[in-house]
Amino acid sequence: MRGIVGFYITYLLCLILGIACVVLVVHWNFMYRDGFAWDGSSKNFNWHPVLMVTGMLVLYGNAAVVYRIPLTWGHNKLPWKLLHAGLLLLSFIFSVIGLCAVFNFHNVHHTANLYSLHSWVGICTAALFTAQWVMGFTSFLLPCTPMAVRAFVKPTHVWMGAMILVLSIVSCISGINEKLFFVLKETTNGTKPYSALPPEAVAANSLGVIIVAFGLVVLKILSNQMWQRPEPGDDEGVYRPLAYDGS
């Protein structure tokens, strides 16, 4: 019972932090960066952080922990596979649109693409995520895939999932930091410099801290052996979350 209570407290924290990430990134870009548009202006760029944080981080993180929810244990796994794959697909769509937003902004302003460390890590993360989704779909959702193949692929699939989350966190916080260095320059646009810690810097830095906290909570859920979904034949195929203590 204690293991289950601990899970739901941690999972509630995961949900709260995820919502906070989305709210803060929208607040930052709406209140301090003038909102959103799709016209090649800076408002066009603002879609990039919002969609990447929402897609590659929050939706991705929640998709990763679906199988850990005890209420799903002992039931047909297919609906949860579909939910897992669906959240990841939505995450992929958000991420693609987010990448299109930044490429469109750069192209309109004749700015080079993929030159910074942030962009290198980010595009590698997106590529790995795409490969991970394709591997997961072909290995675990196609009924024709042999069980031996699924068993062979699963450890790599799980490991890659955690690594992609870590890379997403790195991409998000490096992107936030890069953006603040670009826009908070007293000598070029009259704003207070980043070093003076104006309100925008406080809001964006707070977003970065919450992103890290969200990622750590998701990794905690994924790494706790007590919260792993019991496999068939492990004497835990019966749905019993209220009595389950992780032993």
From Swiss-Prot:
> Is Membrane included in the keywords of this UniProt record?
yes
The residues listed in the UniProt record as binding heme b 2, with positions renumbered to this chain, are 68, 84, 157, 228
What this protein catalyses is:
Fe(3+)(out) + L-ascorbate(in) = monodehydro-L-ascorbate radical(in) + Fe(2+)(out) + H(+)
Q: Which InterPro entries match?
A: CYB561/CYBRD1-like, Cyt_b561/ferric_Rdtase_TM
Q: Where in the cell is it found?
A: Late endosome membrane; Lysosome membrane
Q: Name one Pfam family in it.
A: Cytochrom_B561
Q: Does the keyword Iron apply?
A: yes
Record: residues binding heme b 1 = 48, 113-116, 118, 178
For the Lumenal compartment, the record's topological domain ranges are 25-46, 104-120, 177-201
Q: Which UniProt keywords apply?
A: Electron transport, Endosome, Glycoprotein, Heme, Iron, Lysosome, Membrane, Metal-binding, Oxidoreductase, Translocase, Transmembrane, Transmembrane helix, Transport
GO biological process terms, alphabetically, are: intracellular iron ion homeostasis
- Record's PROSITE patterns? CYTOCHROME_B561
State the superkingdom.
Eukaryota
The residues on the Cytoplasmic side of the membrane are 1-3, 68-82, 142-155, 223-247
Q: Which residues form the Cytochrome b561 domain?
A: 13-223
Q: Which cysteines are joined by disulfide bonds?
A: none
Any note on cofactor binding? Binds 2 heme b groups non-covalently.
Its primary localisation, in coarse terms, equals membrane
- Glycosylation positions in this chain: 189
Q: Which cofactor does it need?
A: heme b
Q: What does this protein do?
A: Transmembrane reductase that uses ascorbate as an electron donor in the cytoplasm and transfers electrons across membranes to reduce iron cations Fe(3+) into Fe(2+) in the lumen of the late endosome and lysosome. Reduced iron can then be extruded from the late endosome and lysosome to the cytoplasm by divalent metal-specific transporters. It is therefore most probably involved in endosomal and lysosomal cellular iron homeostasis.
Please give the name of this protein.
Answer: Lysosomal membrane ascorbate-dependent ferrireductase CYB561A3
Q: Which organism is it from?
A: Danio rerio (Zebrafish)
